Amino acid sequence: NALSFLTDRFLSAVNASEVSGAVFLDLTKAFDLVNHSILLNKLYVYLKDSESLPFFKSYLADRTQRVYLHGSYSYEGKVLCGVPQGSVLGPILFCLYINDLPLHITDKSVQCHMLADDTTIETHSSQFPDLQHSLQTALSDISAWCKHNHMVINPRKSKSMVITTRQKHQISSSSLSLDIEGNKVEQVQSHKLSGLTIDDSLRWQPQIEQLCKRISKNLFLLSRLQSVISFEARK
């Protein structure tokens, strides 16, 4: 899958004595900001079938929402954008909506990996300045795509990372200076992506520690239940 492909690319770069740079992008309320007109135009291009468009148009149009609080309902408000969450079609339509994003990245050394609304860009190089330039160019391209497609990047929740060996981190400066429309992107030593914590030396220590904590917690709960339920049930 996309996550294993991404980590394999990081490992290949480390084995080739290169440095990888990645930016983990956070799209603000991504599912809620999908523009219906743009989505329908993209569906027409992908499906090449105008007969099915009325179905999708009716699926998206005339939706309302209201709030229930303390036994009372608010007035209904029209839903003018976004795809229905909790539905089967919602995530599929969103993936089709952002499917053309990688095509707008002009620097072809930069790869774009998308897992639903988790978008990661990465590249690798033996020269750190080249790494910096490629990632910043890609961020500018993505910002332009987001403006055109009514998406919003949250620079405070977006993170960057330099992935290389621990020895290279110690002997050389590996600090990225990236920004999204003038807002600095924080560089981190580890980041959780789709449940997997990736660290900047690929030693997987943060992931192992988190996994051990979860296992320890579950074992403790099972030990407390040993006097309540049978051994077979605990298995």
Report residues per predicted region.
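Short, conserved non-catalytic motifs in the polymerase core
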Residues: 1-4, 22-24, 67-93, 122-128, ...
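Short, conserved micro-motifs composed of acidic
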Residues: 71, 152-189
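Basic, alpha-helical interaction scaffolds
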Residues: 182-235
